[in-house]
Structure formats: structure tokens, C-alpha cells
Amino acid sequence: MPENYTPAAAATGTWTEEEIRHQPRAWIRSLTNIDALHSALNNFLEPLLRKENLRIILTGAGTSAFIGDIIAPWLASHTGKNFSAVPTTDLVTNPMDYLNPAHPLLLISFGRSGNSPESVAAVELANQFVPECYHLPITCNEAGALYQNAINSDNAFAVLMPAETHDRGFAMTSSITTMMASCLAVFAPETINSQTFRDVADRCQAILTSLGDFSEGVFGYAPWKRIVYLGSGGLQGAARESALKVLELTAGKLAAFYDSPTGFRHGPKSLVDNETLVVVFVSSHPYTRQYDLDLLAELHRDNQAMRVIAIAAESSDIVAAGPHIILPPSRHFIDVEQAFCFLMYAQTFALMQSLHMGNTPDTPSASGTVNRVVQGVIIHPWQA
């Protein structure tokens, strides 16, 4: 670890805060490294991407799985390639449903430690099921099994994140966002690279700076018992990750949910009461934004939630009608870029809510039944 990697300067004295704060710097470091790997990556990927029937699966467990939820929709539309997101936890239990031997496969495995039992098993199962299988692990741990196995394999190319993104805190913060940015830079280098992404890093740094020492919270403090994050398209993945952060860092003391704004009406809205905080991630796409704002206006009219907060790049009459956060000024961001901004608020909220509720964010599970690297998983051998 770098010598200056210490939580001493963090107001809360936690690794989690330090790891939230260093994200913008870590992204640029990682994308600079990927720029330098461009030729080697091309040599590995170009022959694969020319295969018309290539499947590209983004996989991981927990937070690492949500990376795919956030970025796969944009990567698929931007590149025209067959990107999909499937958690390792599904690949391992139901490999026959996801691993088609008739199609070549590129498995992109995300992992902070690279040692999750399901992540290691998913790679082995993919090799077992798919005759023409390739691997691109993106991981934060040089000593982890994902990285070590890949560098010794002929069908793999490993991409290593900066050491400081191997988060020491319980919850994944800088690890998820750096792996996200890095995967985008691998497959869309003309759009996402160390130069273009500085706008995202600068905007996110402005968000973190605006929150000061974090003591005032992000959405204030109130005796809410539930929080719901809502986002459309890939932003539903960001909403899912945001909900998990709260659940993890408060050890379940604050119940957390996620959905899309349109999906929320179909039953899940039943959970909204006067102890519920609802946060809406408003899309930057003019078409999608209409649906987000429709639901936001509906929640204002319902007047059932304790608080409904919109986070958006720009204001509107509907946004301004209730509590809201407008992102610091910048160029127009597509939603996959805006997701990084939304996660800054969500991570910080989870950290401060954890402390506010008497938890220790770096080790929130007092019972020890939930671990930083998952334990207790039995991997059963596949028998055809």
C-alpha cells in the first residue's frame, strides 16, 4: 500500500471514508494504466470481438455483480456487442442456464479480493461448459486467485486496479467504481479514457468537497426506518448498489430497497410510509427523464413518504417542487457517467448513517455473520 494510504486524515477516522474520498484520484490512476495497456488489450480482444456470436458476460458477487447491472446496458448499445450481466452467484448454482457451449464466451470477472468462492468457481465452470472460453478478470488484488489464475492461463488477460482500491473497509467503495471505470475504458476507449474521464473525476471531487467533513450527512438526519433508491436503466444498478451500501453499513438497522421508477408502481410502492426516505436518481437522457419525473411528481402528490429527494444534473419544476440535489456544473453526462456521481452521495450517506446509528462502518457486522470476503460457501462439483 502507498505510504500515504491512511485514514488518519479522515474526519471519521475510518478506512471507509478514506476510500470514498480517494476515488477520483484512483480512477485517473487506473485509466492511465489502461491507456498504457491499450496495445496488449487490443491484441487479446480484437480477435474475440470479431466473432459475431461472441457472448460477453459481466460477472461478480454482490457489489461486484452490480457493476454489470450499471454498465452492461450502455456497453451493449454503444458497441453493438452482446454484453449481459449475470452474477457469479447465479452462474455457480445454474451454469446450465447461462453457459451455452455453442457460443464463444468472454467472461469478465470483477472482484475486490478476487478470492470469493463463487468467482473462482464461475471461471472453472465457464471453462468446463464452453469449449471456446476467454477471461478478462478486473480485480483489485494482485495476490487474489482471480488474478493469479489468469496470469498463468493462455485464455485470459488480467487487468489489475491500483493497490489502494483493494478497500480495507467492509463495504466496497473505491473498488466498485474503479473497476466500473476501468471496464468502460477497456471496451469504449474513445469515449472513456484518462483524459475524458477527468470531467467525471472533477465533478465527483466537487461533490465530495461540497459535503465537507460529511458530518451534516447527505440527506440530513431523520428517524427514517426505510430508504428506497430508484433509477432507470443502468441507474437501477446504481440504485441497487446504493441500497446495499446502506444495508451493509447499518447492519440492516435501516431497511433498504431499490427499483426503477416505473417498476416501483407495480407493488413495491406499498412500502412507502411516513418513516420512508425515497431517493430518485434522475436520468440525463431526455426521454428516460420523463418517466423519472412522472414518478417524482406522483410521490410528491401522494405525500406519504417522510422525504422524497431527487438528485439530478439540472433542475425542473418537478425537481424543484421538493427536496433535491443538483450535481455540480459540468458538461452533459450520459447516465453511465452520472452513475459515478450518484454513488458518491449514496456511499457517503451509508457511511454517515452507519455512524449515526452507532455502528462501526469498517466492521459493521457485530455478530460476525457477514464477512468482508464471503465465507461458508460450499462449491459443489458439476456432474453432467
Curated annotation (Swiss-Prot):
One of its GO terms (cellular component) is plasma membrane. Induction: Induced by growth on N-acetyl-D-galactosamine. InterPro entries: GatZ_KbaZ_carbometab (IPR050303), GlmS/AgaS_SIS (IPR035466), SIS_AgaS (IPR035464), SIS_dom (IPR001347), SIS_dom_sf (IPR046348), Sugar_isomerase_AgaS (IPR014180). GO terms for biological process: carbohydrate derivative metabolic process; phosphoenolpyruvate-dependent sugar phosphotransferase system. Keywords: Carbohydrate metabolism, Hydrolase, Repeat. Its EC number is 3.5.99.-. CDD domains: SIS_AgaS_like (cd05010), SIS_GlmS_GlmD_1 (cd05008). Disruption phenotype: Deletion mutant does not grow on N-acetyl-D-galactosamine. GO terms for molecular function: carbohydrate derivative binding; hydrolase activity; isomerase activity. Residues 45-197, 215-364 form the SIS domain. It comes from the Bacteria. It catalyses: D-galactosamine 6-phosphate + H2O = D-tagatopyranose 1-phosphate + NH4(+). Catalyzes the isomerization-deamination of galactosamine 6-phosphate to form tagatofuranose 6-phosphate and ammonium ion. Belongs to the SIS family. AgaS subfamily. This is D-galactosamine-6-phosphate deaminase AgaS. It comes from Escherichia coli O157:H7. The lineage of its organism: Bacteria, Pseudomonadati, Pseudomonadota, Gammaproteobacteria, Enterobacterales. The gene is agaS.
